[in-house]
């Protein structure tokens, strides 16, 4: 390896951005094909390619940051800014869903019966499963903060316990959301209410799955002694993402489940 007289990481050529982009194309087009033609082939291929890309890209970053020492303080600063900008872009992504929901609900058209929820729609009780889901996610926010403080204080066992609990709560939330979808008295095809409900809560559910995976990787790394009290940005980024998912759910709960019902 050539000598470098600066603290910045010159990244080696990598195939993973390309394979990740192809996986994203297959996932989005595969979802459309699944909706319209009931074929899961493209969606399955996209998922397999995405999982392979995630595994190998994360593996390479761990090698560069943990074992080769490329993640110097200036590089970590850049990663922090990158994560902040990514979460900001996600805020605007969800803002679009809230905009669609409020556009439809604040001035319902005659086609909807001039009321919200639209005529013929039976809404979900906000004080049953949705309230339980809120409690589960808020509890997971507490446990991920516990894990963060444990890492900073060098409490290895407590970090593992707190991370495990957070991941289990994330999986429990996903299970409850899946049951709610299965038993819902309306579908994504039931007009603007069904589409805004399932798209907004569905994308949030997808983010919970992504966040749970992110935290699971952090748990494996913690077990392998990758994190120290000074060097643990991989976990910090996962914790920021998880808190973002928590906050989005609170807005979804208040807007769609409680006010919207």
Curated annotation (Swiss-Prot):
Places the protein is found: Mitochondrion inner membrane
Membrane topology of the entry: Multi-pass membrane protein
Pfam families named in the record: COX3 (PF00510)
Membrane-spanning ranges: 16-34, 41-66, 73-105, 129-152, 156-183, 191-223, 233-256
Known role: Component of the cytochrome c oxidase, the last enzyme in the mitochondrial electron transport chain which drives oxidative phosphorylation. The respiratory chain contains 3 multisubunit complexes succinate dehydrogenase (complex II, CII), ubiquinol-cytochrome c oxidoreductase (cytochrome b-c1 complex, complex III, CIII) and cytochrome c oxidase (complex IV, CIV), that cooperate to transfer electrons derived from NADH and succinate to molecular oxygen, creating an electrochemical gradient over the inner membrane that drives transmembrane transport and the ATP synthase.
Quaternary assembly: Component of the cytochrome c oxidase (complex IV, CIV), a multisubunit enzyme composed of 14 subunits. The complex is composed of a catalytic core of 3 subunits MT-CO1, MT-CO2 and MT-CO3, encoded in the mitochondrial DNA, and 11 supernumerary subunits COX4I, COX5A, COX5B, COX6A, COX6B, COX6C, COX7A, COX7B, COX7C, COX8 and NDUFA4, which are encoded in the nuclear genome.
Name the UniProt record assigns to this protein: Cytochrome c oxidase subunit 3
């Amino acid at each position: 390896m050539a000598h470098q007289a600066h603290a910045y990481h010159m990244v080696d050529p990598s195939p993973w951005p390309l394979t990740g982009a192809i996986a994203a194309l297959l996932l989005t087009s595969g979802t459309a094909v699944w909706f319209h033609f009931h074929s899961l082939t493209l969606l399955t291929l996209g998922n397999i390619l995405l999982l392979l890309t995630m595994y190998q890209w994360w593996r390479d970053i761990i090698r560069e940051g943990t074992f080769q020492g490329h993640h110097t303080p200036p590089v970590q600063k850049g990663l922090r800014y990158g994560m902040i900008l990514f979460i900001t872009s996600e805020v605007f992504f969800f803002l679009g869903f809230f905009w669609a929901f409020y556009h439809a609900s604040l001035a319902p058209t005659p086609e909807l019966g001039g009321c919200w929820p639209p005529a013929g729609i039976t809404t979900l009780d906000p004080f049953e499963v949705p309230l339980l889901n809120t409690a589960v996610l808020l509890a997971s926010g507490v446990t991920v903060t516990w894990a963060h403080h444990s890492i900073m204080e060098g409490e290895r066992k407590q970090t593992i316990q707190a991370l495990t609990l957070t991941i289990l709560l994330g999986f429990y939330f996903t299970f409850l959301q899946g049951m709610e979808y299965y038993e819902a008295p309306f579908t994504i095809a039931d007009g603007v209410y069904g589409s805004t409900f399932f798209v907004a809560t569905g994308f949030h559910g997808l983010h919970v799955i992504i966040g749970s995976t992110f935290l699971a990787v952090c748990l494996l790394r913690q077990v392998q002694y990758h994190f120290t009290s000074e060097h643990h940005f991989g976990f910090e980024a996962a914790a920021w993402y998880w808190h973002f998912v928590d906050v989005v759910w609170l807005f979804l709960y208040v807007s769609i489940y409680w006010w919207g019902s």
